[in-house]
Every structure is written in structure tokens, then in C-alpha cells.
Swiss-Prot record:
Chain intervals annotated as zinc finger (C2H2-type): 413-436
Organism: Danio rerio
Family: Belongs to the VEFS (VRN2-EMF2-FIS2-SU(Z)12) family.
Domain of life according to the entry: Eukaryota
Protein name: Polycomb protein suz12-A
Amino acid sequence: MAPQKHGSGGNGFYGNSASKAANGGAHASSGVVMTSVKRLKMEQIQADHQLFLEAFEKPTQIYRFLRTRNLITPIFLHRSLTYMSHRNSRTNSKRKSFSLNDLLFKVEKSKVDPESHNLASNLQLTFTGFFHKTEKQLQNSENEENSVSVEVLLVKLCHKKRKDVTCPVKQVPTGKKQVPLNPDISPTKLGAFPTLVVPSHEFEPVNSNTVKSYSLLFRASRPWGREHNGMTTRDTNVIEELSNRKKRYCSHQDDGETTFVAQMTVFDKNRRLQLLDGEYEVSMQEIEESPVGKKRATWETILDEKWVPPFETFSQGPTLQFTLRWTNDTADKATAPVAKPLATRNSESSTVDSSKTSNIKPPQAVAVNDSLGTDLPVRREQTHIEPCQKLHVYYQFLYNNNTRQQTEARDDLHCPWCTLNCRKLYSLLKHLKLSHSRFIFNYVPHPKGARIDVSINECYDGSYVGNPQDILCQPGFAFSRNGPVKRTPVTQILVCRPKRSKPSLSEFLEPEDGEQEQQRTYISGHNRLYFHSDSCTPLRPQEMEVDSEDERDPDWLREKTAMQIEEFTDVNEGEKEIMKLWNLLVMKHGFIADNQMNQACMSFVEQHGTIMVEKNLCRNALLHLINMHDFGLITTATIDKAMTHLRDLTQQSIAQH
């Protein structure tokens, strides 16, 4: 409309050109406005995303810190929780038949019967071959050795004593075998290969030193020259440039022999078995290649054409292949020792034949089927028939009722914040709800597993509920406690415990009415810090029961009372001493009522009777008691008892002298 108004005052040409110019300016201005709007939207999105990260960052850091602190000083054991009962491997079924008289019989039977020993299995090693590829074959193939001498030593790492600087190590030779070099891979029976057996008694603890861990040391040696040690051309050039110091370091070996070593742990320091039945291929390392001086570890980018020794080991060698079995002397059956291996992330219990890992069923699918409501028997039948699959768990983070981020699928049931292996979906959700209440977790069924919506709990009470004294202590006070300490008194709300419902995933579903569960504090107590009135130091929890303001007889008040009595002029010295003792007694015990005077007089002669006898104050004490009787505070019976006690003390004093 504006161009039409300007064009009406002149010719048509001017009005037409003005309208075109105005239309062009309008298009240009609209483009600028659109760009600014997009820029504002992007800035708003970035700012909103930054707020989302900040909202989830603080609780995550708090829970990571709590995880580390609970690992150092745990407050409770997760296996003792009701929803974590599957983590407790111990059962109380044997307690009913337990008898204290049977302990000696069981110990004697375990010593006599060798078959009842925990480690009654022998370690059998069947060597398949020693593989070491060379870049060029030797010219004199007639003299070439087709076998390698392999020696196996059992290394026992013992506990360090006070006088020892390092842990004592014992090497027990178990045997030496000739292993074929670079054999052809063909289905040959294990009986055709050299076999070595480590007896079971070698794994028994030693009397002098308690063994901490057991490991196997493989030492392979081959009589060949240094120029034909199986390395490539550039490796030979590198080895030829060794310094004289390194050559002297390796002078214990012959010039025509090269030795390779490798070590594998059998039992770790926790007595857990690390080597199960199966076929192994271990990478051997030449002794001469070990560096003399220490080098700093650095990060390095691996290129496609670059030769990397650790990755080329299993393709070029040297490697030693062998089959490991745990066997008995009587029967040649593979029986694993009682020491349990390291549990896998998705297996609830370890099986005996651990080489067949495909038969192990993960417990996640069973947990889902066991926890869902009405069609429980049908789904349990399907669980036994169909093979169990891994349960994929997705975490979807919500902020302002909008999805901000979704994690990749996890095939385990570990808590993302404290890395606790819950092993079951119900246990994971229960743990997240109770242990990480700064967030709100809602379970959503997913076709491939489960989805957990995570949002910030706005109703969380984040006030400090611990000891206020810890705030003023050093930062490392929580890590330096040697034992439990007394906390401030708290009040716990008594609630009715209804009949415990069966575990069900429906309790973690999002409520239909949209109202979030209100989190409230069920334990209330003192979170204020109090101070002593005289020293201005913080009041400790063990001092809360004593009123700091109720200072009846501090040292300064006792001294001031004695000085005031000394200033009296109308009484004699004996009466002054009786007044001092009586006033200090009343200040200490806080006698304030008339009915307490009989007890006060008896306490007076019992506590200070010896002093009154030594200073000859018995008559002054009698006058004091009579004076109190005149005022109606004590009875004559109290006077008789008190004076009888003083006379007994006087006779004892005379008898001693």
C-alpha cells in the first residue's frame, strides 16, 4: 500500500519503479529477519542444551563421588538387601543341622581324606606347537631343528613379612618337554603331543610362607644363531645395533641359543581360578628384547602401513599353543577345582564346563519374565524352552518434558552411576529408585528390551542430613575414620509394614494421572551445629547428652568460692573448711531441694570424711549437721549415721598410726 501512495502524486513510470524498489527491499528485509530468527532459535537451543547438561551434571558427579566413597568405606552390603538377594551366594539351610561338636570331626576328615581337598585336581598341559614364522628359511635345512625345548616353572608369590623388602618368590620346576616347531594344523589326537602334569599338592599352601598367587612361567629355548632368530631383516639390524651394556646384560645366554618367556596367572591373590579348561595361545617374548632402562609410556597413532609388534605377534610369532585341562589321578575327566573363576558380566553363576560359554543363559530375560503380572506361568514355560537372549537397556534423558538424549543399548544390567551389577531388571530399577533418588526413573517396555526414562527430581530434599561437625573437619575426614563414630540423634518415623507384594515391573511404570511421586524425608534430626560457651569449640555428638550451659562446678568457680569464704571474719578456720567442702559438694551434685539434704549429708561424710578426720573437723561437722536439723532439713537419724561413719574413720586412722 505504501508504494501506491507515493506513486499517485507523479507519473506512472515513477510509481511503477518505486513499487518495484519497495518489493525488492521487502524481500531483502524478510531474508534478514528469517536469518535472525534462525540464529535466535539456534542460540536458544544451545542455551537450553547447556542447561540440560548442567542439570544432569551435578547429580552425576555426586553419585560418582559416593560410589568411590562406598568402595572405600561401605555403609551396607548390597547382598543384604531384599531386592538383591540373588547376589548372596550363601544359604542358611545348613544352620538347622549345624552342631558345634561336629567341627573337629570335619577337620580331621578333611586332613585324612585326600579326595575332599579343595584343590584335588592336577593341572595337565598338552603342548600343540611352538609357532614362529621367519622371513627367509635357513639354507642348511638339514641342520634345522624341528622342535623347541619348553620348560614350565610354577611361580609362587608369597606374602611379604616385616623383615622382607620385597615379596618372596619361589620357582618350582615342573618339567621340560620338546614341542614341535611350526607343526601343520591337522586333526591329531592329543595323545600324540607332549603332555606335562602339575600335581595338585603344588597348589597347597606352604608352612613357612603363605602363598599369595600361583602362576606358570613358560621358558622356550631353541639352539639357533642370532642371525637366524626368526626376526625380520629390520629387526636383525636393530638387534645388531645393541650396545655393549645390553649384550653384557644378556651374556648369561649362549650365542647359539635364543630364549623366549611368558607367564600366566593360575590363581590370583583372592584364590580365584584364572585358567579354565580350553585351548590357549600365549605370546612369547624374547629375553634379549627386554629394555635395560625404563622408558616413559606415550600415546602413538597407529597407521595402516606401520609395523606394530604387539599386533604382529600372533601372526608372526613367537607363540606357544597348548591345551589346558584339570584332571584327577584316578579318572581322566576334566574337573575344575573348587576355586571359582571370575564371573562374567551377564552370567549369574559359573558352570563347571566353562569352555562352552554358549550354554550359559543370561539371567536378564528370566528376570523380565518373572516380574511381569498375569501370564506368569506361560512366560516361565517359554523361558525354559526358548534360548535366553541378552536384554538391551536404553536410557532416555528427559528435560522439561522433552527428550534430550538417548544412550546406546547396553547389554548388561550395571548401574550407570555406581557400576553395580544388579543382574536383574527389577533389581536395577529398584536400585535406581532407592539409591539415586535425585533422578526420577520410569520403566517403559521396549520391543528389544527395556527403556528407562531419566528426569530430574525437583522434589528431592537436598539438605545436609549428616553430622554438622564433619563440615568443619578436614576434607579427608570421611576417608580417615578407622571405625564407626557416633552421630547426632535422629528421629525415625514409624510406619506400618504391610504384606510385602511380589516383585513386579509395573511399579516402575509412569503413573497415568501424570502426578509424580512426591519424595519426602522420612528421617528428621538435628542438623544444627552447637558450640561450647566457654571454649567456643563445636559440640561433638557424644557431648549432646550433657548440657554445656549447666556448668555446675568449673575450676574457676570452685576457686572463686574458696576465695570468698576465706574473706569471712566472723567464723573460725574450722568452720571455713567445712563451708568450703559443703559448698563444693552442693555445686558438684546440684542439690537444690529440701528432700535431698539427707542424701547430701551422707554423701558429704562419705566423700570428705577422710579430710575431716585428718584436719580434726569432726566437731565442726557436727555443728553443721545440728544447724541443718534446726532448720528442719535433716532428721536425727541422719545425724547419727553421719557421726557413726566419722567415728569409724577416726578409729581406723588411730589404728593405722
